[in-house]
């Protein structure tokens, strides 16, 4: 099918010039439109519509279809309109048909178009023959065709415009007939038809466009009003939602605060109960501890009483062990108030003249008693309740080696009994050398002479300590707080000198 490439007004003008049938094919995107388009593209249809047909194809979504539908209502899609010279639709095909059916319809339209053309020629001849004798019955015939053409070509919903145009055309025709010029009017009719129709179509299209613009403006205004109304409603709805949300949040917060307060109250009550329970438990514990402490104090008091009684009993007696130079020893008990002279006399009576003139001394602490000490009490000399005293023969130092008595018998006995004597000395030193704790209190409550004696003993020990430190200085080398043994190289290191960069100078 050869489709006209141009707008609808140009296609109408081309059809008018050639006296052809104006074909308008309104197609869409559906399946029927595709089938109908295929029928139009068929070779049979192309051959049948090659002469006396000006065809144009428009889309339903285009502006041309909108303009065309304002004159010829488009009922369904697809649609095919066959419009004659007068603007009257000769045939309208609604929907999709086959190619053969379409060829049949085209032939039918050709017959209708040719018959209408002959009728129009006959009417023109009759009008020319009757120009000399005009009558009243001719007037409606002369103006019938323009009126019908105008009505058929411009058939739209706006019927008031068509009626006004028809009335105007009628008046013009009547005026011409009364002025005895029917022949001139009939000659100008073909030229006027096309111009008037095009002008009317253009004017009506402009009016329709203006109405459409106004309608669009009104529609936009309504849309804007609706949009504003909808926006206001949405804002109101959102505000209500926000208010409800805020209200719910406040209620939730109030409920949470109430729950927090209740939880805090429960915690406070639990803390108070725990404190009361701990206080009661602590009081019970304190009472139990106080009872235990009282029982312990009572027990300790009883123990102290026993100790004091034992100490008093023991403090009244001084047990003295006399150790002889040959390693033997003997023991005797004396009153604690007895002087040391009594103990010396007992030792002299026991040993006789074996060791001659001797003196008494203690080894731990090391002390040799003088003549003045013999007059003092055993308690004052810290020899009560027990002590170990060594007999020192005259002329021998306290640290001298003890020799056995003359005679092979004593040597043999000393050799045999020496292990037993050593064991006995260890046991006796362990048992009798250190006084019990009760003696410390007795010593603390001793008189002033005992303090003076201890001070004199400490004064005697000072020279010995100094000599030991001097001797230690010879054997050890002090480096800060560390002592190390001296070697042969230490003397050489002390004689050497060192410079600032740790290099030895000889």
From Swiss-Prot:
Residues 444-456 have a biased composition (Low complexity). The modification Phosphothreonine is found at residue 487. GO terms for biological process: ERAD pathway; response to unfolded protein. Residues 457-489 have a biased composition (Basic and acidic residues). Gene3D superfamilies: Glutaredoxin, Phosphatidylinositol 3-kinase Catalytic Subunit, Chain A, domain 1. Residues 412-432 dip into the membrane without crossing it. One of its GO terms (cellular component) is nuclear envelope. InterPro entries: Thioredoxin-like_sf (IPR036249), Ubiquitin-like_domsf (IPR029071), UBX_dom (IPR001012). The UBX domain is required for interaction with VCP. Directly interacts with VCP. Interacts with UBQLN1. Forms a complex with VCP and UBQLN1. This is UBX domain-containing protein 4.
